[in-house]
Amino acid sequence: MSNDRPMEPSIASAAQLAKLLRATGYLADDALATIGFLALRLGRPLLLEGEPGTGKTALAEALAEALDLPLIRLQCYEGIDASQALYDWDFPRQILHLRALETTARIGEGGDGADGPDVEKSLFDERFLLARPILRALRESPAVLLVDEVDRADDEFEAFLLEVLSTYQVTIPELGTIRATVPPIVILTSNRTRELHDALKRRCLYHWIDHPGLARELEIVRSRAPEVGERLSRQVVSAVQAMRRGDDLVKPPGVAETLDWARALMELGASDLDVEHASATLGVAVKYREDADRVRASLDTILGA
């Protein structure tokens, strides 16, 4: 049974959400603000896909800050399974506890430490439970749960996620069923290294995030790196936009690289992005040797864009 619920009416419109996000330094366009607002109002997970560096993870961070909620992050990777997302038992502490019970039983000639069922019950007490991100999000809600790079996980983990997101509850055999009093706000991100299953997509609202255009990216730099001069900011953003227009880079720079590049140039005292400064700091913007070689070979064209 679905546990969807509309969010409390604290955010009345997409425009209000965009304003709250802007106050954290995150500039959402109208489409993203609208789908984010609908996800909050309808109580549905939001799946964000896009190239690396387009601000998918940053949206979850900004949303948690804007709503004054804890951010709980589940970083997906190849081979992740349900136990690594849900919970585990603190085995070393359980062993110490068991030894303490045995010692108590010997000294007291019986007592609680000698009772088998009681021993087992005490071993699987909540004090020995290691809550992983999903269980934490269910127990600590309201919270923002970020399931980052879900495309790196496998089909089995996707099926597990779908079940959790359908019920917002998990069952721990030794403790029973744990339900979220208020379901967490769930943001899933994917770099689309593989296609996600339709069942998971149907469960979520969906939005593709593109790299920002020149005007919006310049606005982001002004907001996030106000210490960088206007002229240098424009030159950096123009250069990054030119790099992205080509289709020959392994990984075009994202917004994070734009910000880092602008700040790095400022630290070097550069007031203009010329060929010398660009070549010396290229490793801030591009992270593959072949990309650096291609960009360096065409810097005159890129800087003149």
Regions found by a protein language model. Give the residues of each.
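C-terminal regulatory/interaction module of P-loop NTP-utilizing enzymes
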Residues: 1-305
